């Protein structure tokens, strides 16, 4: 389906994009603020280091020619090394094991 859309420049609406799997969630005008607030709240629950790292690694991976190269490049990315060395990288599994909410430090 993606190739057909690319070659024909066919546009799709939000509902069709959702059915195809590249739109995460759809809301009408009346529900948009609640959807955005819910999404933001979910993002804010995560470690700031993890969010920064995830964004950087997606960009790194997308610049690669294939999945194997993307995985290799991501593991060599300075953002990945910084995350692995962070206190937050240890706090997440520790909080999970202790059945408590993590206390992110942001480093």
Predicted regions and their residues:
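C-terminal long alpha-helix characteristic of the crotonase
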Residues: 14, 23-74, 104-107
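Short helix- or helix-capping micro-motifs
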Residues: 1-10
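Short, glycine/polar-rich helix-capping loops at beta-to-alpha or helix-loop-helix junctions
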Residues: 10-16
């Amino acid at each position: 389906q993606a190739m057909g859309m690319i070659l024909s420049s066919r546009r799709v609406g939000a509902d069709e994009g959702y059915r195809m799997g590249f739109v995460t969630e759809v809301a009408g005008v009346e529900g948009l603020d609640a959807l955005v607030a819910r999404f933001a709240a979910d993002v804010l629950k995560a470690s700031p280091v993890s969010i920064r790292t995830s964004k950087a690694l997606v960009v790194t991976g997308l610049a690669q020619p294939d999945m194997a190269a993307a995985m290799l490049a991501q593991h060599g990315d300075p953002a990945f090394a910084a995350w692995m060395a962070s206190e937050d990288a240890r706090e997440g599994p520790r909080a999970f094991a202790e059945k408590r909410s993590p206390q992110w430090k942001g480093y």
